A protein has these predicted regions:
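Sec-dependent signal peptide recognition
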Residues: 2-7
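Hydrophobic h-region of N-terminal signal peptides that target proteins for export
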Residues: 9-16
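Extended terminal accessory/targeting regions
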Residues: 16-204
Length: 204
């Protein structure tokens, strides 16, 4: 099997401006307003051309001090981001989206935190990686409205994982909707709470 490796140099990389999330309005991290990555991650693309196996851990500390880890051995494929969005926003492992996508995939697979917190992490990690405010907010909207969500956290009873109930967003994705939302974000510069309200609005 031909192995293709990529190295992400993420040694204690700090990132720029942040609005505290709704569940922690007092959170302020002026030194690392978008959080920071630490360590390095090495990954191997598998022969199927879709899956990537992490050969070392990726750590991200979000602006509220919560540490998110993608462990070595994790297999990711970008599935936490609906595939239909790839044509609008680019592939999940393209350019500046890559680190945030890896963490988001692992968080969605583990389901040990609320999906809203995972999506907020994804937004902050994108900004930490240098994704523009408009692109990051548009992707956040798309995930919040069309993402694969769950009602209950996955717990562990002894060595047996308790299965969670998945609640898919059965809403069709249209390029027109995404482009209209992107234009609104560019012109109005909404907060994440305003974006969430728009995403929760009934389909016309």
């Amino acid at each position: 099997m031909r192995k293709i490796y990529f190295l992400l140099a993420l040694a204690f990389t700090a990132c720029g401006g942040h609005q505290p999330p709704a569940w922690d309005v007092a959170a302020v991290r002026p030194k690392h307003p978008w959080g920071y990555y630490s360590g390095q991650v090495e990954a191997r693309w598998e022969n199927d051309g879709r899956h990537t196996t992490l050969l070392s851990e990726l750590h991200y500390t979000d602006p509220d001090g919560v540490v998110w880890t993608a462990p070595a051995g994790s297999v990711v494929d970008g599935a936490s981001i609906p595939r239909v969005l790839w044509s609008f926003m680019g592939g999940p492992f393209d350019g500046k989206y890559r680190n945030a996508s890896v963490l988001h995939d692992v968080a969605y697979d583990e389901k040990t935190r609320p999906w809203r917190q995972c999506d907020r992490m994804f937004y902050n990690a994108m900004r930490c990686s240098g994704v523009s405010p408009t692109e990051a907010k548009t992707m956040y909207y798309a995930l919040y409205r069309h993402g694969r969500h769950w009602k209950h956290l996955r717990g562990v009873a002894g060595a047996i994982a308790v299965e969670e109930e998945t609640v898919p967003r059965a809403l069709p994705v249209s390029e027109e909707e995404i482009q209209e939302t992107r234009s609104w974000i560019e012109n109005a510069n909404p907060s994440l709470s305003q974006i969430e309200a728009r995403a929760d609005a009934p389909t016309q």
